[in-house]
């Protein structure tokens, strides 16, 4: 009877996981279908504004990614991290966003949702190798801006409007392997303990970028005796690229008492990633039409111009990141991690290359993108005097300075973000599954050398709430482990 009771509990927990995954996928795929997840007018240029491919655990730390070794979450931007996962994991998230845009005396607020990535790591418990795969959003357009111009000319007043939609996503497949060493550490005066003191993990990913972005501009003249104008462009992008990563940790010191009980330690983490340049292929269509807008119905009168180009070649820039972290652990379970990370991506090579098509469009120019991140995590003490769910949670916070890959009027789009959140173990589940709750706030705009913002230029205040989940199998499910009867 006890066996059937345990089996029943396990099946209930399994069904809970399946329901949670189904709901998460339903919400996220609904947003993916729309692809309009970036209402910022800055998304007009290029492929749209890039979306961090990081999952909630990394975003809550300001985007720190390359050095973080955490066996209970997936880090899609660091291929080597998969080798350090404790078991097979599935991870995804959704994001609820609010953007407050201001330009001069005009203000506008937009609420929208966006999906996170779908990530999977397949690993045998206790193994040294792992396979990771997933789909993550890369860029998005979703802007809709307009202005009405009043003139004393014969043509009269007219309205200009600009809209964009679509986006790109990246699917990836990777492999990672870790090399570990152990060392005897003294425990008291006459004993010792064998501990892992050093490890190096190597990983590689191959990824495929694809998607379509659409931009449309309209000139609508109020006087119906004049015809109106519409210009639209569609670009379908695809690119095959690679990403390589390395992670290492070194035990700085560890203390054990004469009973061989752990007292405390400090560990250094280091990590780096590199993605080489890759070819970008684009199918482009551009149409310029004369239209007439009557009773909210737009009728095409004439096609003034139509051009299309297949397999136009360009470049995706190289990208690298490097970072480090130090971890302090205590016998009562308290754990503190302090980390820093830097990422750079040189988009100027796109304009300098012999590209057959201008994917940027507009008055902007390419620039060198970068992200500087600082983050920390804290695990409270977990001794018997304080064993509630919060004591077993991980609290995170971070700060990031962003430089975007576009410059306008000679000044680069930049911003800052502050974030915080908590990863909570999934109650009632006999696994290492976690639920992630986080928020992020920041600002984005075009500045000058002294840090001020152009007069009459667009400035955005951003706020985001994140909900994510990392699902792991029941701890007694030895997946990928041969059984006696195999």
Residue ranges, per PLM feature:
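Bacterial N-terminal signal peptides that target proteins for export
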Residues: 3-19
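Sec/Tat signal peptide C-region and signal peptidase I cleavage site
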Residues: 29-34
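Subset of outer-membrane beta-barrel
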Residues: 35-486
